[in-house]
Amino acid sequence: EPYRRQRQMCIRDRRLAPHVPHLFKAVYTGTQADIKRALKAEEMGQLLDTKCTRKQSELLQKTHHLFVLMFLLRGLPFVDLAYIQKKDLNGNILTYHRRKTGRQITITVTKDAMNIIREYMDTTTESPYLFPILSAEGGEDTIYREYQQALRIFNYQLTKLGELLGLTTELTSYTARHTWATLAYYLEVHPGIIREAMGHSSIKVTETYLKPFNIKKLDETNLSIIGYAKRSFEG
């Protein structure tokens, strides 16, 4: 967009640049949607140790623990975490509909995930929401503004958490989701299963998540095959 504005300024002065219709038609000036950031397995393992922030502020600890919970719940998006209701949790079974796609998701909650839920769940009778991220007051617009504010705070605290732990990958509310999908891919889970687990609207969405890691995995496969051939000859 800045290039378009600069060119328009030059076109106004015909001595600087001629007008060429649809000059930018075939030029992509946005951001690549398929570039996703995921943590390495060892980095996610470090984050799964929920005690590593016990000396930090209460807000940072909560952010850390909720991030871990999102990973434990199959890469749960923050928007779904915020909007999940108490009635969606029945014993250790969580059933909810994704805000983005409307697809129903059913998850068996692990012991570690349940411990985090019990620590941070809203225990009041006034709110229908499982976590005290949104209030039950006001209309949909008010609640959505609350969600946006909560998301900004969450991402800011995640940045601080990443710096504290010395992570090489920037932490955002999407990192848990991308990490879950990527680790599943490296464990050779079929993309169709990953799609169902994450509630994607189509397999193409899942492939978008995994595309940046295809080359690396193919390179690793190539090295494994070469190594296997060498060992077979030496043996």
Regions found by a protein language model. Name each.
Residues 98-102, 198-223:
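Catalytic-site neighborhood detector that most strongly recognizes the C-terminal catalytic loop/helix
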Residues 1-7, 11:
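Single conserved hydrophobic/aromatic residue that forms the stacking wall/gate
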Residues 18, 106-111, 115, 120, ...:
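DNA/chromatin major-groove-contacting recognition/catalytic segments
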Residues 52-58, 155-196:
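Short, basic (Lys/Arg/His-rich) helix/loop patches that form interaction surfaces
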Residues 19-26, 83-119:
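Conserved tyrosine-mediated DNA breakage-rejoining catalytic core shared by Y-recombinases
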Residues 125, 133-142, 224-235:
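C-terminal secondary-structure termini that scaffold catalytic or DNA-interacting sites
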Residues 22-62:
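Long, amphipathic, Lys/Arg-enriched alpha-helical "connector/arm" segment
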Residues 87-95, 168-169, 189-208, 234-235:
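Short, polar N-cap/turn motifs at the start of nucleic acid-interacting alpha helices
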